[in-house]
Amino acid sequence: MLKLVIATALVIASGLACAAEPPLTAARYAQELGVGIDVDWARTERGIREFDPLVVRDFHAKGIRHVRIRVADEPTEARLIHLRKLVEACEQYGVIPVIAYQADEYKNDPKADNEKEVINWWIAVAHYFGQRSPMLGFDLIYEPADKLNHNLASLNRVYEKTIKAIHDIDPQRMIFIAPRLRAAPEDLSSLKLPPRSQNYLLAEWHIFPWGPLKNNGKYPWTSGTAAEKAAIHNRIATALRWQQKTGHVSWVGGWGVGESNRFTPTASQMAFATFMACELQKAKIPYAVNADFQFYDGEEGAWRPAPEPLLQVMIAPVCDKPGEKPGHRAVKPAARDAGRATPAAASTAKSAAPSGSSASPD
């Protein structure tokens, strides 16, 4: 009788454990992504050389919950080993890793051989990670642009084949696909989505990857006029309409305010950053800040002091609430563990680097 009671209790406990941990879906994954940052830990020689696992701890302490790991070169054994080191560091410190492939040759010349190269690149990466690291995401093509802007059929074909190949290896892997025109939200509707893919496929899009740069002789942001704010709001609304229509969720893979690592942020930059972050958070769209080297000195293992207030606004903005008068806002608390971690500068251990990429930051 006692054995029966124990067995029953174990079955109930097992059922409760399963009930407490629902299966990972794209919607829940998007919630977990929160605010992240684009990193060059696997793209540039300097980024590879300077990576220290404790940097991930510093990022988490600052409130960063995911990193977009940009990769430019072939998936050699050394590079795959380095990627695994990055992913393991992220898992250790509670940061979600997303690998993003630049696919430059394909973007410049979307011919059949280059299509195959992209697919094979991801097959190699997918095989290497197998079904491990369930929170690891794959961002298939970083900012589709150049000649690919004029070949939608090729882009959708590569996405279709790559998604199938990856899910033949790991059916649960979270995958991001981006539209043309450097991931413009207005082009989301051109993406060909596999049937019943809402639970594992997310869209990546973004605006202002390097801030509100001059376009056609005008800056899209000066003092934050009503027209400037409406233009940004409308682009975010375009993505929200696509989400509602398709049932898919999306992620802003990178936005910035312009060069900020050597200068004290201007009032205009702070206002722009606050508005962008608040609009995205109101829309419940996760996003990554572009980019790590603007805010973090990898060689010193410490945050750059000048742009730190700007980064804080981008991560945890103080937003007006509906019906509240502008300026009457509660201060948003910083990350709970922000003041506890010893900076990575205290660590002298550096990761061994594979043959690095000569790519420079975008």
Regions found by a protein language model. Name each.
Residues 14-15:
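N-terminal signal peptide c-region/cleavage motif recognized by signal peptidases
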Residues 22-174, 179-191, 309-318, 322:
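Active-site mouth of glycoside hydrolases
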Residues 325, 329-362:
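Compositionally biased, proline/threonine/alanine/serine-rich low-complexity intrinsically disordered stretches
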Residues 1-7:
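Sec-dependent signal peptide recognition
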Residues 241, 312-336:
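Aromatic- and carboxylate-lined catalytic core of secreted/periplasmic carbohydrate-active enzymes
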Residues 239-309:
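Substrate-binding cleft of secreted/luminal carbohydrate-active enzymes
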Residues 35-51, 111-113, 212-232, 265:
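Acidic/histidine-rich helix-loop elements
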Residues 119-220, 225-258, 282-288:
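Active-site region of glycoside hydrolase catalytic domains
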